[in-house]
Amino acid sequence: MIQVDKQLIRDLYDKAVVNPRLRQNMDLRNSPDDNGQRMLNALMPGTVVPIHRHPMSNETVICLSGKLVEVIYEEDDIAKDFPMGMDAQDVPSGRRLKESARYMLDPSLGNFGCVVPAGAWHTVQVLEPSVIFEVKDGKYGEDGSEIF
């Protein structure tokens, strides 16, 4: 059994602060074959979480400590009129993103978490050292996740 307590949170913070990525996760699955993903993630200010999405799963994010902003993006239509002889294949990614929502996660204010809809592009901005509990459907590496 794993008990999530103050000592575990402190240990995650201690590891995150010395990690070059400024974050540290702890896998809470029973085995790599689990059909769901459950983890704690300690995030330090300055960490960069690339904009990404999970096309086949919602992502539940609960902030256990700290303060961060979950930022949601939506795809913006690319230019509809291309110069003569060009089409959408000539646009590098064929898509752009625009910010559509921001959710402050701060348990001290009673804002504990959010559910990011399947397919929504998102990232986090860490305002102070934070630990989140994340849950997604599907096996790790097989859930269709992609980075923008």
Regions found by a protein language model. Give the residues of each.
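Double-stranded beta-helix
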Residues: 3, 12, 77-78, 89-104, ...
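Short, surface-exposed charged micro-motifs
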Residues: 40, 60, 123
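Short beta-strand His + acidic residue motifs that chelate non-heme Fe in jelly-roll/DSBH
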Residues: 50-52, 70-71, 114-116, 122-127, ...
